[in-house]
Amino acid sequence: MPDGDDQKSLSQSIKGRLQEGVQNSVFRDKGLLDPDAVIDEDRIVGRDDQLDDIITYLRPALQGNRPPNMLLYGPSGTGKSLIINAVCQQVLELATSQGDRFGVIKINCQTIKSHDRAVYRLVKNAAEEAGVDVGVPESGISTDQKLDRFYEILSNNFDSVIIILDEVDLLVGRQRDPNDEPAYSKLLYQLSRASQLGRIEGHVSVAALTNDPRFMEDLDGRAESSFNPQDVVFPDYDANQLQAILERRRDAYQDNVLEDGIIPISAAFAAQDHGDARKAIDLFRKAGEIADRAEEDTVREAHVRDAQKEAERDRTLTQMQGLSTQKKLSLYATAIVPVYSQRNLNAVPSTVAYRVYQYLTDILDAAEKSRDSYLRYMNEAETYNFVTSEKRGRGYGSGVHKEYTFVDDPEVVAETLQTDFRLEGAEHEEDLVKSVVNAQIDDFFDGN
């Protein structure tokens, strides 16, 4: 263990490095690049219609009336949470100024596994919003008792409440039978009926946020009738809108640290991924973090490209967590074909990839599966959105083969798969593997 002087020196060194990192950072206000931050109205882009609708629907809360229930739907990163949170924040401030008790109770349903857990999370968040004790344990009592406590908190502390259920379609619950009512259906019925049944003295409205345009089709008939929401549709952002979103967060960075073209290329990458503003903002932030790590005072295009690769690698790694070794090996064999090819390959012939797979099983001392098994593994890779496939003919009498195109950069896929210790041996034999890949490509296309 270090003595007193060494410990003091270490503390000073850590403190100095922390201060230096803050002082030399390219960021001025990094919080502006948090996709979940509630932002000012002048930073909102391309959502005028949705903003108008939600303002109209929530205005009754300031007039002593109940706002309608709402269903906000559209792909991820299209501004659903951003807009509802921004409007609710303004309603809260105006209501407080005129002496009304308005509450906003939010939960994200992504990680909530059951109806009971969702109700407890509502109780907990309502208690926090009201500044009172939760009053019930997480387990050991019935869901109805937790609901009673939730209604009690709302009645005692608020005149009007909006309950925001983000990613509500993920609150499926434990369905023992495909015909069982999903947990979100039961919860929506209970919340939307609470005022009508006299369970709550004030006004209660529910805003459900989902990516699924067919969400209402899965609701129980009673829940659908009781919830009866006003729909607000959020389409994808286009590249110009994404660019404008980033421009309005430019002041997250210090003056003159952004190289020309940083914002357009960040927007272009995100536009390729279904116009997701959340991903555009993440990419814009990660580029700055990479510049900070490299102790550079300018955010360059190379940092954005590195950030895009990091994002792809993280996404790929997450998706690959549950894949077996054979599935990873099949995907790896396919990915290295365009990476190692001396030709410009846009698509990978399954014939070539399978032969490379056979070679890899040999050098890695892994079991060799049949061609049909390889094709089955790649079909599964397609369902995970790693690749797309197309059947191709090679002329009369030459048969048909599949060709695979990678959704993300195949080099990123290959590098990510190499992190599995069972595939490390392939990296050690890189020169040999390259020669095999190109020999198989030449044989396929030239018949040598």
Locations of regions flagged by a protein language model:
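A short, basic N-terminal segment
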Residues: 1-68
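Mid-core helix/loop region of P-loop NTP-binding domains shared across ATPases and GTPases
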Residues: 10-15, 114-120, 128-218, 222-229, ...
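Walker A/P-loop nucleotide-binding motif
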Residues: 65-86, 90
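Conserved catalytic segments around the Walker B and adjacent sensor/switch elements
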Residues: 69-71, 94-111
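Conserved AAA+ ATPase "sensor/coupling" helix adjacent to the nucleotide-binding pocket
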Residues: 122-126, 244-255
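C-terminal helical "lid" subdomain and adjoining coupling/linker elements of P-loop NTPases
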Residues: 256, 265-326, 341-346, 364-370, ...
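Short amphipathic alpha-helical interface segments
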Residues: 325-359
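Terminal-proximal interaction/regulatory segments of ATP-powered molecular machines
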Residues: 347-448
